[in-house]
């Protein structure tokens, strides 16, 4: 059983959680097989494979976590409305998942969000509220809406069901490439890499999980070095 640190508490994600998430996502998301990269293989002297989640439904891996969270809560019978804060990919994932089960969704986006992303989110059935100039301000507004309406907030990464959904990527990688040595994962908020690592390591503890984060926003790298959560 893997333990994932969360503000002094611990998320407990077992392999069965990822398998349950995969069942919920079956026949919903696209099956995207691994693709070999001749260029990167030549550059590194290793066999390099790519998983193009930009070709996923709604254009991002984010739909995995959002759909798993919303479907799990919907099955429990007490989900009537959801709220999320996002500048794009999570917004579309939540909107798509909510509309799939007829649940009202409200997405709070910063005013600087490109109109194309606003329109795409509305196209999946969400009500969009523009608030603030940065994500933190949109997040604060989303929390206000939840407080006022009783809707449930769908966090983009700090949620075990969201992590379980994102971690289904690891199940697919190991299905297609059982003897993979290393998995490189982009790291932003940490939901994707947490899910992938927790899932993959339970199947094969020898797999190395390498997080890659932008130098200009190294919150996870700083947190690992400090042994506690640190901002960028």
Enumerate the language-model features and the residues they cover.
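PLP-dependent amino-acid enzyme catalytic core
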Residues: 2-232
């Amino acid at each position: 059983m893997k333990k994932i640190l969360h503000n002094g508490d611990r998320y407990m994600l077992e392999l069965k959680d990822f398998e349950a998430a995969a069942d919920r996502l079956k026949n919903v998301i696209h099956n995207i097989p691994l693709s070999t990269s001749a260029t990167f293989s030549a550059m590194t002297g290793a066999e390099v494979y790519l998983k193009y989640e930009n070709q996923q439904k709604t254009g991002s891996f984010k739909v995995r976590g959002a759909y798993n969270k919303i479907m799990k809560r919907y099955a429990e019978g007490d989900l009537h409305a959801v709220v999320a804060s996002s500048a794009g990919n999570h917004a579309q994932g939540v909107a798509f998942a909510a509309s799939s089960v007829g649940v009202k969704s409200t997405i709070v986006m910063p005013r600087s969000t490109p109109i194309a992303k606003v329109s795409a989110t509305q196209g999946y059935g969400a009500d969009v509220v523009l608030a603030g100039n940065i994500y933190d301000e949109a997040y604060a507004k989303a929390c206000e809406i939840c407080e006022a309406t009783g809707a449930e907030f769908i966090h983009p990464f700090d949620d075990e069901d969201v992590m379980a959904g994102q971690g289904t990527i690891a199940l697919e990688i190991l299905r297609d490439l059982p003897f993979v040595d290393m998995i490189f994962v982009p790291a932003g908020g940490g939901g994707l890499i947490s899910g992938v690592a927790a899932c993959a390591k339970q199947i094969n503890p020898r797999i190395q999980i390498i997080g890659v984060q932008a130098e200009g926003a190294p919150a996870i790298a700083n947190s690992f070095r400090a042994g506690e959560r640190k901002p960028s």
